Amino acid sequence: MKQEQNRIIRDTKSDLLFVQGAAGSGKTSAVLQRIAYLLYRFRNGLDEKQMMIFSPNRLFNHYIANVLPELGEKNMIQTTFQDFIAKRLGKLEVESLFEQFENETNEARKEILLLKESTFLFELIGKYIALLQKGGLRFKDIKFRGETVISKEDIQAIFYATPRYKMPARFLETKKVLREKLYELANLEAKKAWVKDEMELLSEEEYRALVPTKLEFQSFDDEQDYLAKKIVRLKFKKLHKSVLDNQFWHMKQQFGHFMQYAPRLFDLAEFNISKEDWENEIHRIVASLNENKLALEDAVLFLELCDAALGKKVNRIMRFVFIDEIQDYSKAQIAYLKSIFPSSQFTLLGDLNQAIFKRNEKSLLEEIAPLFDASRTSVVELSKSYRSTEQITNFTKEIMTESERIIPFSRQGDVPKVIQTENFVAMMDVVQREALKLKKSSNMVAIIGRNQEICEEAYLSLYKKMDVKLVHMGNQKLSEGIMILPSYLAKGLEFDSVIVLDASEKTYPSSADKTLLYTMCSRAMHDLVAVSNGEITPLFKTIPNHLYEFETLSVKTQLPSDS
């Protein structure tokens, strides 16, 4: 373990350091020590602002923020992939972690999502941009006081009249011409009646703000002319800014057109996608864009399209990028980050057994390896799990079919408990009983549910009976005591005790749920309890009986009425 951790901590040469580790194997600890080591090793030429870590959620960010000062280091730049993308999107809203997880069950879109998560469409954007050099760019009218002052047709004519430079240069030239036109239009606008009306309504204070104290006019007309132009130019400032910000280009419409045009550049059938499903996907994207929203898998494509047209704003100062829970990233997302940070060395951490968003069974390392120089790629595997007791690790590894390489740490404890109940009320009675019992010996007891809905139901059932906190997207803070949180907010974290909420057949029906269930169970350090409403999940039934304690409660509890 020491040797492997040293490889992680002290590697300064690899462009890609890929750390595959079992849950609780010390990945995060090693990487935090790596950060401290790098800051010390390059102390004369590296500061914390040249290092960035992508965490699975904001809860994990709080954890890192507390740990780094303990290592004697200042905090580096911390973000989540969603927050990073949202910042680059500006006014467009990217789907939250909650929405991303809750929408995961749509099987009809599986093949389309696999396509988007590859780099195929990402790379196709280059071909599409080349076609746009000849025509097809979507523009918007530039309006002032509700009237069009430069039409989209005029903008299109200006753009395609520019020399055949690369697309970003043509946009720069177009902006230059548009701003010149705005200056001309401002002079014409200054002669209109509304300007005279505004001048007459100016207060003394407003007048002084427009006219410098030392300025003297030769005549009343000179003064009026000056004021008129000043008023209009101030009003036109917004138009100039909108041009500088490329708001005359209809980016949302352009992205919709790209998705519509894309099947002309490849065969949908090769990706097992029907024309009908693709059309439905376009309708979904357009509907989202009309609400100023984008799904995460679309956001990367949208940004790449904008970057290809306008020029990519890269960060060449960033030296080291760390990505935790890499198993939940797509190849397209990694490719985008690599293009944004071209001078960075990447450290990727993950456990392929914990992929809760990924749909592709292909090895992640195999997928992303072509993005990096093979001669400057290092892979470190950590197979020993130190987080949980031997009993919990032996139980959780049996959930996965290919977990032979997970080696438990020889810390002893109780075997996990699996309790089957008949209904929701009975289940919540057991959850309350177990949580209060565990709290006596645990600082943090986490009741983890599959999604936000089951967590909210559990909270409503418990909050009047015991002290419990609900952790959700709007309140991502950890505290001691008993908390309820959805699976996707538990990523990367550990708790003294874990209660898996509703580990039933209806909630986790098939092998497709094994990575999610494994992730939830492997958060526990000392105690693990799983409670089901109805028949337990078949994923537990394949675990040897001696590895857990099974209990069936057949208490006849009256269910609440719907009224």
Where is each model-derived feature located?
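Pre-Walker A (Motif I) flank of P-loop NTPase domains
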Residues: 13-17
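Conserved glycine(s) of the Walker
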Residues: 24-26
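Hydrophobic anchor at the beta1->P-loop junction of P-loop NTPases
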Residues: 19-21
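Alpha-helical nucleic-acid-binding subdomain
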Residues: 39-322, 327-336, 344
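Motif I (Walker A/P-loop) of helicase-class P-loop NTPases
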Residues: 28-38
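Pre-Walker A adenine-sensing motif
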Residues: 2-11
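Conserved helicase motor core of SF1/SF2 NTP-dependent helicases
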Residues: 58, 66, 70-74, 79-83, ...
